[in-house]
Amino acid sequence: MDVKERSNQFRFFSLGGGNEVGRSCHIIQFKGKTIMLDAGIHPAYQGMASLPFYDDFDLSIVDVLLISHFHLDHAASLPYVMQKTNFKGRVFMTHPTKAIYRWLLRDFVRVTSIGSQSSNAEDDNLYSNEDLIESFDKIETIDYHSMIDVNGIKFTAFHAGHVLGAAMFQIEIAGLRVLFTGDYSREIDRHLNSAEVPPLPSDILIVESTFGTATHEPRLHREKKLTQLIHSTVNKGGRVLMPVFALGRAQELMLILDEYWSQHKEELGSNQIPIFYASNLARKCLSVFQTYVNMMNDNIRKKFRDSQTNPFIFKNIAYIKNLDEFQDFGPSVMLASPGMLQNGLSRDLLERWCPDEKNLVLITGYSVEGTMAKYLLLEPDTIPSVSNPEVTIPRRCRVEELSFAAHVDFQENLEFIEQINASNIILVHGEPNPMGRLKSALLSNYASFKGTEDEVHVHNPRNCYELDIECKGVKVAKAVGNIVDEIKRTEEEVVKPENDAGQSKEGIEEFTGKTQDVRKDAEGEGAIISSILVSDEKNFDLNLVSLSDLREHHPELSTTVIRERQTIQVDCKKELIYWHICQMFGDVSVLIDDDNVTNTKETKLETSRGMLVLQIMGAIRLTVQHNKAILEWTQGLISDTIADSIIAILMSVDSAPVSVKKSSNSCSHGHEHATPILSQPSETDKIKQVAELFKTQFGDSFTLILNKDDDNDTAEEKEDDEFVKGLITIGKNTASINFTDMCVVECNSNPLKGRVESLLKIGIDMVSSLC
């Protein structure tokens, strides 16, 4: 699957978990980066058939693999990917997930294999214990809320609330943010917090759809119903089988039962009705729950602090590794893994207890299509034996389903999706019918946005179907180095607080209003900062750096400074060249003046090289000696423009009319000619010329007020009208100009004031005499 590296196409590809629950594995690609999300197995199948469709994708191009949590349908094929394929990327999961994953996968290798029905089972396993150990050492851990950057792929883990260590990942590539929820829960239960909403917005949301549009009962109602079902069954002498995953929901259910048994000691306690947890992993993983108790909710942490004992050391629950330790006499409650009843202790107990009508099988988790747990919910008359499928066992026991699966229901999912507010939603981890109903419900919910910029697109791709979405990430440049201080100084100059000591309340309010107007004007105009924008195409970073900091912050960049040099033949005196340069440019520094051309020395040097060296606008060095003018400067946009202007002056200085007039004063003979004296332009004419410049710049926002003497005016009025006024009004910003003195009288906007003063300076130069 080829993806153009600089394309704006976001590609989503499910290798598993598309329109199904099980073997979750998704690929996302953007800007040449590839991320794999989860690597599970399908609990309804065995061996190679349980794997995601890895053959349909080149795993060698995967940069990062993120595991959301330790459940087998999300993590069990990870050792296969790392040891049996051409995968070369890095693998990340949270600390609790890695701690539990080790024990869970070791048990999976022991219990489940591709060749469980064959004599060569060990050779046919998906992977061995050695593969598991070797791959385990390569897995990297990530803390919640810490951002990891892997070659331009930035991702952050947030609490998902599904099981201990479960995480949802917000991934950012080139400004595009993708949120992958994994399995998540928005309900605060007895030991876990609810899933978090990331603070930063996401453009694409990949979200589970396990329960579709179904709605859960309130948790307290479910707990009450659970204890009532169990209590009534054991009171009648029956046994209760609760198939559970070894870790996760099992601990939640045990917290409920342990508390209930303690509250009903007379009837149930003191081993009258025993509770067993049949799992080889229980004791091994108990230390993990002890270690990470501070990652759980306030309720469990409070119990830990108050009692100084681990809440997961249960008083009324005993652990057994296998059925050889179990004395099956009288009523009891058994929590046994695996949760899908495909094999193991839970399947053995099912076959033993299902013929007795007094017994109860209580399904508390989600049942995947094709598993015994799902089949049992149909209440069949018989079930096949796991050791010999041709042998059937009568089913007379009761079967009840009471979901304690830590997955969101429709209302919780909808509220979360609305908070994320992504423009594209991709549904995963759901059977076709529930997922289809959820898609229809979401489209109906967002129907009012259809055809607008805020339209929300909902996708439910099947496995091995390529979904392409046109996306454009938001590019944000980060200022680094000295440029940061320059930006701060500029911001301070835009809005400078005035000294408000002794101001009245009205004065303070007026100043505050003016400050807000200035800020608005500054935001509109924008402060101009000169810097270099450096783009790291590999990591998708944009940095604003000053030229002086370039080598420090980007040593990988090579910089080149180009010096320009131009030589021009001139046939005029240095005095004339200097005069023209001074008339054109305001910043002219004299570096060397051997002949005192600039009249800056009291006497001329006795021995002169005849050299005149000028520094013009701080950028151009002009050397005039004999009949040659040499220009030297560092190449740049502004310096090149100034150099072009100087060259134009030097090329025309000897033929310009003003040069003839200027040089004619030095003639040796002096006689007067009757030449008419031309009238000089009046001050009013000059003001009108400058006012015309303002009219061109500001249009109808500018008004010129020419005061005329009136015999009826009082002395005070005549004194006020001594200067010609100009008024500029732009929204709430005003500027009053004194054209007589060519200055700004009053202005409530610093940016506007700066612009007016610049125009006044240009106007003064424009009407000033060249002679």
UniProtKB/Swiss-Prot annotation:
This is Endoribonuclease YSH1. Component of the cleavage factor I (CF I) involved in pre-mRNA 3'-end processing. Keywords: Endonuclease, Hydrolase, Metal-binding, mRNA processing, Nuclease, Nucleus, Zinc. It comes from Candida glabrata (strain ATCC 2001 / BCRC 20586 / JCM 3761 / NBRC 0622 / NRRL Y-65 / CBS 138). It is found in: Nucleus. GO terms for biological process: mRNA processing; sno(s)RNA 3'-end processing; snoRNA splicing; termination of RNA polymerase II transcription. The keyword Nucleus applies. The active site is at 407 (proton donor). GO terms for molecular function: 5'-3' RNA exonuclease activity; metal ion binding; RNA binding; RNA endonuclease activity.
